[in-house]
Amino acid sequence: MRRLSSVALALLLVAPASAEAASQRLLVNGDSLAVGTKRYIPRELEDWRIRQSTAVSRHAYQGADVMRSYGASLPRVIHVSLGTNDDPNQVAGFRAAVDEVMEVAGEERCVVWANIVRPPVAGKSYAGYNRALARESLERDNLRIVNWARMVRRHPEWLSDDGVHVSAEGYRARAKAVARRVRRCGS
């Protein structure tokens, strides 16, 4: 009888951890950079259930619709990798896309968004997009930024000739940084 009580107690102590692990769900919503990290994110978040909706050339304005398509099953944590394919002259449009993503997420979900690295388009840099993300994150407790721009500045050897995509080492590092932020959601 004493042994049975010990087993029952052990099961009770383990049950909450299992329930917590099952509730750790992530949606990756992104462009070609998310395609690049697709194989590495699950390695960094082995105890998470991960869904990935990635498409080369996906735009920021498409992000909210991707999230809406999940309906009530939208995970509590969402990683967004969008903005790289958008016109840097349209900061207001990007800001509107960020607002729409955050509106769909609601206040109960955590959004982890990687800021943007790419060469200027028509002489305009993406600094305005990164400032918009930084400002939004100051106003919203549930928006966390992965400072991809800083990471790439520290490791320019990761960049490919197009100045956007990176080596396998760069994608692994990006996945690790995303995973660190994802794990902090809820804390």
Q: Can you name each region flagged by the protein language model?
A:
Residues 17-21:
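Sec/Tat signal peptide C-region and signal peptidase I cleavage site
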Residues 53-55, 114, 146-151:
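Conserved beta-strand termini and adjacent loop/short-helix elements that scaffold enzyme active sites
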Residues 119-187:
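Catalytic His-Asp segment of secreted/periplasmic serine-dependent ester chemistry enzymes
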Residues 106-110:
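A short helix->loop->beta-strand "cap" motif at the edges of active sites that frequently abuts
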Residues 1-4:
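Positively charged n-region of N-terminal signal peptides that target proteins for export
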Residues 27-29, 112, 144-146:
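Hydrophobic/aromatic beta-strand patches that form the interior of the parallel beta-sheet core
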